[in-house]
Amino acid sequence: MIQEQTMLNVADNSGARRVMCIKVLGGSHRRYAHVGDIIKVTIKEAIPRGKVKKGDVLKAVVVRTRKGVRRPDGSVIRFDGNACVLLNNTSEQVIGTRIFGPVTRELRNEKFMKIISLAPEVL
């Protein structure tokens, strides 16, 4: 579960390392975001000469959470940390060209097939 002020790792090569959630999108007073939800983030830590810089405000999609994802068969997939992939603010296209670490099958919809195809492992 991701809420405002949550720090997340960035799972792509856009140049950001750590981001902070500043808003959960979708609904007027939505409190939590789960895997596959879009959030608004600000970049807290970035590498030099990256595509993004510290202080930028972007959209991101949550790809891994410590809370995990519950499947219809009752199984739960949990991860060691919270991670997201940065998106362009207007077109919501992926900024990076590589995805690091596994992602879940819950991202498999029309919007995020690019993330599924770039990911090294889909759980």
Swiss-Prot record:
<comment type="subunit">
    <text>Part of the 50S ribosomal subunit. Forms a cluster with proteins L3 and L19. In the 70S ribosome, L14 and L19 interact and together make contacts with the 16S rRNA in bridges B5 and B8.</text>
</comment>
<dbReference type="Pfam" id="PF00238">
    <property type="entry name" value="Ribosomal_L14"/>
</dbReference>
<dbReference type="GO" id="GO:0006412">
    <property type="term" value="P:translation"/>
</dbReference>
<dbReference type="GO" id="GO:0003735">
    <property type="term" value="F:structural constituent of ribosome"/>
</dbReference>
<protein>
    <recommendedName>
        <fullName>Large ribosomal subunit protein uL14</fullName>
    </recommendedName>
</protein>
<dbReference type="InterPro" id="IPR019972">
    <property type="entry name" value="Ribosomal_uL14_CS"/>
</dbReference>
<keyword id="KW-0699">rRNA-binding</keyword>
<comment type="similarity">
    <text>Belongs to the universal ribosomal protein uL14 family.</text>
</comment>
<keyword id="KW-0687">Ribonucleoprotein</keyword>
<dbReference type="GO" id="GO:0070180">
    <property type="term" value="F:large ribosomal subunit rRNA binding"/>
</dbReference>
<keyword id="KW-0689">Ribosomal protein</keyword>
<dbReference type="GO" id="GO:0022625">
    <property type="term" value="C:cytosolic large ribosomal subunit"/>
</dbReference>
<keyword id="KW-0694">RNA-binding</keyword>
<dbReference type="InterPro" id="IPR005745">
    <property type="entry name" value="Ribosomal_uL14_bac-type"/>
</dbReference>
<dbReference type="InterPro" id="IPR000218">
    <property type="entry name" value="Ribosomal_uL14"/>
</dbReference>
<comment type="function">
    <text>Binds to 23S rRNA. Forms part of two intersubunit bridges in the 70S ribosome.</text>
</comment>
<dbReference type="InterPro" id="IPR036853">
    <property type="entry name" value="Ribosomal_uL14_sf"/>
</dbReference>
